[in-house]
Amino acid sequence: MAEDGLPKIYSHPPTESSKTPTAATIFFGADNAIPKSETTITSEGDHVTSVNEYMLESDFSTTTDNKLTAKKEKLKSEDDMGTDFIKSTTHLQKEITSLTGTTNSITRDSITEHFMPVKIGNISSPVTTVSLIDFSTDIAKEDILLATIDTGDAEISITSEVSGTLKDSSAGVADAPAFPRKKDEADMSNYNSSIKSNVPADEAVQVTDSTIPEAEIPPAPEESFTTIPDITALEEEKITEIDLSVLEDDTSAVATLTDSDEKFITVFELTTSAEKDKDKREDTLLTDEETTEGASIWMERDTANEAETHSVLLTAVESRYDFVVPASIATNLVEESSTEEDLSETDNTETVPKITEPFSGTTSVLDTPDYKEDTSTTETDIFELLKEEPDEFMI
């Protein structure tokens, strides 16, 4: 037992190489009692060292002094101050200082090697890793940074104080770090501790690399990865498709369109001339050059083949439907519109009779020879569908 209340832990170097690090593991588990056992630490140089047995007398989770008992000799020291240090012996003069920054010295050298396994609280998985420290022979004092794994969002500072008596190779520990009590995950952020060692030159110390097996390290909670869903497992988007094609044998297709279908119709023209009104040029799907050339070719073909059957160029600009106008209905539409427009003084009345001749032999736009004329459909139904008057057509 050190007079200053410090546990004294010393070790001797491996026989193979003093710089060969030995591997030690610190486990933080749910158990507060450490059974007596003998552990071997094997370094890369095949140096095997026996570790003394310890048994925990009280709970580590409290902030009062706790004691680890073993079966070795009692050690004495000259200070009675409570500090946060672990003192070692080596041929180098080192000083290990914790966060409180207090330094003490030791006077005894007849100290054997000890290793303390530690279990704190109810943590079932390890939460920290100690880095390898390799002392060189030409450095007197040096700050050693020990970093831990970033395992959470909360910031926890280690302010533990190591005190007590080293009786029969026993050590006392007070103020264990306040680790979270969750078993599934550790909520602890990065914290650093500065350590210095102050040891006599007649002893040798081998600082070990305390590591934790990879299988026991819990994943950091903040490193959450978004799982990409399987594209093949996604449900196919349902798209409602409406087939609005007019069947050849459906003679009442034009008359049976509902009011909800009428709102999509914006322009509906019957064109047979090369000239169109300048105000309606934006309604055509062709450019100015293509429109003029296409219309000229159309009119030339009509002029050369007047005896043949002519079809009506039916344009539904910005419309979603293809309309089929029977020949009889088209003829009746033109004759009726000619009578009404002759009574009004407009510029369009003179051009109406010119369309009667192509309409007399009109076939459907689909050019189907088996198409049946719809004798039950009248021009009134067509205009009710379009909600327009005959004189509004640009002919």
From Swiss-Prot:
Gene name tied to this protein: CABS1
A matching Pfam family: CABS1
Q: Which GO terms describe its molecular function?
A: calcium ion binding
InterPro entries with a match to the protein in the record = Ca-bd_spermatid (IPR026118)
Please state where this protein is localized. Answer: Cytoplasm; Mitochondrion inner membrane; Cell projection, Cilium, Flagellum; Cytoplasmic vesicle, Secretory vesicle, Acrosome
Q: State the source organism's domain of life.
A: Eukaryota
Comp. bias intervals (Acidic residues): 337-348
Q: Does the keyword Translocase apply?
A: no
What is the designated name of this protein? Calcium-binding and spermatid-specific protein 1
- Which organism's genome codes for this protein? Homo sapiens
Residues annotated with Phosphoserine modification: 273, 319, 376
The UniProt annotation puts the region (Disordered) at 1-20, 335-379
Keyword line: Calcium, Cell projection, Cilium, Cytoplasm, Cytoplasmic vesicle, Flagellum, Membrane, Mitochondrion, Mitochondrion inner membrane, Phosphoprotein
Assigned GO CC terms: acrosomal vesicle; mitochondrial inner membrane; motile cilium; sperm principal piece
Q: Where are residues bearing Phosphothreonine located in the sequence?
A: 287
GO BP terms: namely:
flagellated sperm motility; spermatogenesis
Task: Quote the PANTHER family the UniProt record gives.
Answer: CALCIUM-BINDING AND SPERMATID-SPECIFIC PROTEIN 1, TESTIS DEVELOPMENT PROTEIN NYD-SP26
Q: What does this protein do?
A: Calcium-binding protein. Essential for maintaining the structural integrity of the sperm flagella.
Q: Which cysteines bridge via disulfide bonds? A: none
